[in-house]
Amino acid sequence: MPKLKTKSGAKKRFKLTATGKLKAGVAGKRHRLIGHNGKYIRQNRGTKVMSEADAKIIRTYLPYGL
């Protein structure tokens, strides 16, 4: 069985926590933020833990973790 390759885009965008959950940056934060209030912008700063359904798909891109 050959070694599995890690998807390069996934290793740049996602981080694993110590308990095995995946963290990722919040989408929709590049531009057009004038209409959003400060609370929305503040709460979506940094990274968030992904839902288990999405994390299951991303784990297939990271066969050996990070």
Swiss-Prot record:
BP term (GO), one: translation
Listed GO MF terms: structural constituent of ribosome
Keywords: Ribonucleoprotein, Ribosomal protein
One GO cellular component, as annotated: cytosolic large ribosomal subunit
Similarity section: Belongs to the bacterial ribosomal protein bL35 family.
Protein's recorded name: Large ribosomal subunit protein bL35
Gene name in the database record: rpmI
